[in-house]
Amino acid sequence: MSQITSPEFTQSFAPEDTPEGPLSGVRVGVKDLFDVKGYVTKAGSKAREVLPAAREDADAVALLRAAGATLVGHNNMTEFAYSGLGLNPHYGTAMTPLVEGAIAGGSTSGGASALAQGIIDVALGTDTGGSLRIPAAFCGVVGLKPTAASISSKGAVALSHTLDSVGPMARDLETVRRAYDVLSAPANQQSGALTHLIVPENFGMTELDDGVATAFDAAIPLLEAAGFIVERRKLDFLDIYAQLPIWHFSAVESRVHHAVQYEQTPELIDPKVKLRMARADQASAVEYAKTLALRARIVEAAQAELGLSGVLLPSVAILPPQLSALEEDAAFDRINLLALRNTTLGNVIDGCSISLPIAGTPGAGLMLTAPAWRDHAILDAAAKIEPLLKR
């Protein structure tokens, strides 16, 4: 087995014969938290290198393989998928080719960077708070966070079993949809076109980089001319959302899924990741139970208020930051939280969400978010919007 040493990959896969199928000839990068038979699943961590090789493919990997895809290698990622910026001190940090010296975003960092460079055609990733959509925006590709229950996560190393979703990225929407059709289980999608989009007045539109704000504002008339109804108003469920200690989910649940590494070889874990995992000690069992109950209330309230409508936001409040700007912990934490802010909404409401690149502003994305089982509707809407953003 040859080893890829670029920061986009942690290891390459040996060539294999592939069956004919809907993804024949499609090169797929697999985020390094999905089991691939015969390879160690490191989840971007030196602490997992001692684990045995996977004995079988993760469900999503098996579906891609059966559809004729060519599996290229394990894509690099934030260790344990625990940040939205994509830094990895062990295997290198993937960068966006769109902005000199800027990061690719995370945690599906290597997949997005490899896509943007044309090394792969599809990146299989996960999204806990934006880990498909943030790097998609930063690298100028399309990232889909589907309804969590629509794609199996069996055989994928979890960060937060409450918020994790499995999904694809690609350079264009058509390829994302082909991959989603292969990966997703038959389900009763909610009917009705997604034509009414709400820009919330009480969430997601502050602290925007000038380039992001300008690109977003310029996109709205294009959507309206294409037949979308875009309304700026307050969403009441977001007032409840503001009360949620979102950090609880990944902090507490990562300590469950990575207990062996955290407790037995903590010195091998990225200090930035370890610090966030340590925050779980600040949440009691009662407090976390309250967080789960509040999240369930938010899901119900969002579904009731949005109905067949969707939320329209910039994918990320900021343009891709320079790697050099993230050296200090305080700066890293501030930028990480701002990067995750808009995308995390889709995970908390148990919805579906997609980021589309805005071609005129490298590193900026337009994001549609809707309640659960509106995946087909959001993909149909995105198909109408994608060409508008290429102008």
What positions do the PLM features span?
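Short, well-ordered alpha-helical
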Residues: 1-58, 81-83, 216
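Structural helix-boundary/capping segments
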Residues: 2, 62, 66, 70, ...
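Short helix-loop capping/hinge segments that flank enzyme active sites or metal/cofactor-binding pockets
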Residues: 25-43, 248-299, 355-365
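Gly/Ser-rich, acidic/histidine-flanked active-site/gating loops
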Residues: 28, 34, 182-246, 269-273, ...
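Short pre-catalytic strand/loop immediately N-terminal to key active-site residues, enriched for Gly-Thr
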Residues: 48-55, 92-107, 332-339
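Gly/Ser-rich catalytic serine loop of serine hydrolases
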Residues: 56, 100-112, 125-126, 130-131, ...
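Glycine-rich, small-residue loops and helix-cap segments
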Residues: 66, 289-391
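Acyltransferase
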Residues: 212-234, 259-264, 287-308, 336
